[in-house]
Swiss-Prot record:
PANTHER family: XAA-PRO AMINOPEPTIDASE 3, XAA-PRO AMINOPEPTIDASE AN0832-RELATED. Keywords: Aminopeptidase, Hydrolase, Manganese, Metal-binding, Metalloprotease, Protease. It comes from the Eukaryota. SUPFAM superfamilies: Creatinase/aminopeptidase, Creatinase/prolidase N-terminal domain. PROSITE patterns: PROLINE_PEPTIDASE. It catalyses: Release of any N-terminal amino acid, including proline, that is linked to proline, even from a dipeptide or tripeptide. Its EC number is 3.4.11.9. This is Probable Xaa-Pro aminopeptidase BDCG_04966. Catalyzes the removal of a penultimate prolyl residue from the N-termini of peptides. Mn(2+) 2 binds at D285, D296, E471. Its cofactor is Mn(2+). Mn(2+) 1 binds at D296, E433, E471. One of its GO terms (biological process) is proteolysis.
Amino acid sequence: MISAIEPKNLLRPHSQPVVTTSTLQPDDECNIELRIEDTTVDKYPAKQHARRVAAEIHRDRGLVYLMGQKSTLYEDSDQERTFRQRRYFFYMSGVDEPDCDLTYDINADKLTLYVPDFDLKRTIWMGPTLGREEALQRFDIDEVKYQSSLDEDVKQWAQNQGRGSTLYLLHESQKPAEKVPNVFIDSKTLKHAMDTSRAIKDEHEIGLIRRANEVSAAAHIDVLRGIRKMSNERDIEASFLNTSVSLGAHKQAYHIIAASGSNAATLHYSKNNEPLKGRQFVCLDAGAEWNCYASDVTRTFPMTSQWPSAEAKHIYKLVEHMQESCIVRVKEGVRYLDLHILAHRSLIRGFLTLGIFKGGTLEEIQNSGASNLFFPHGLGHHIGLEVHDVSPESIMAQDNGDYSDNVLISPNNLSPCTTSSPTLKSGMVVTIEPGIYFSQIALDNAKPEQLKYVDLELVKTYMPVGGVRIEDDILVTKTGYENLTTAPKGDGMLEIIRQGDGSCNI
């Protein structure tokens, strides 16, 4: 680990279990130690975030108006939809409660939260909603008021500001219910300002992502411990969910992908219902969410502590090398595009060694786009309040264009990247998730220039491998990186399977 940064105020809610994993020794048990820390909760830095957003707006006056997520019912039903807070609203409030809104007066530096008015019937049935005093204690807010005063407050603000004042909205559809006279509605500036702010995580946010990764690591370890007893993909999903919830993470950052065998060649496989018998690998892409912040962790493993075939071992070790080669190069100023290209070049070299690619040089194969048949997605993405988090510009531009001299790829390559890709900055958290997939659909629909260098007969022997992906969440620092993901992989992963708590049912 290079230049590790320990957040000063790592957030851990009151009386929640903390996960620590012991270092594996050859004959030791892998233990998860659960302890309860009774510490004071630091408030989510909503006011700091509001000021950062205002600085990106580049105006000294105006009112930011953000709507939280409302309680809604499923269509033709009296059952409420599962609540998921709007992430832009959370970023400037820290409030994970329904039916709230906020305003931020840039000139007055005043952040106001609006909470639901008291509803006796709802309180009897569902319990009390967020109140004013509770909200002031829990959140980094200047003032808390009831929803019933919101529209009138906005009108009063506009009147006090005079003609030409600006109301900043995230979307045109989210303007106040009542028309506000003499106000300019700006629904374009705010999103870019918030995307720019959200791309760089502060210490508090890093602490939340770290905590989400701690829970995910424990859940991945429990799957490895029990995999020899499991007989279906759904057992894997159930185990991961059980551990996550028991450690206080009631929500997943995304739908769990528990793909065995050829299912792992489907990048976002979601059925999770097929038997494990006869499958070489499971690709488990699963990450818990903590206080609205995501983790995104992928591990690929066999059903026993042995590599199921020589082909499976070759592909796993190659993906492992692809990932490690990219991670060690992460630091501020590095262009993420170059890491993506490096991963493709590592794949090509590996396939040339294995004989899967033949009849061409590294550059010829690279320019043909043949590696895209086996590695069809980008190297990764930002992560934060969204598992695919926002930024002011795409981490890898998705269109063709010119390439500068220092790029490891030629202009006619078919990879979907251009030099408009930005450089990494300290405080960004990105995933590094190379993969190799043996997809019959991809091969059947390949272009002739891509297949020119592929030994299709040899590929047949690799098809049972399905797919291998390894993914970690990486914090960018000025001089290097910190890997926030602690879930075991490689030999440590196999050792946990060996020490698992059941005989093999596969």
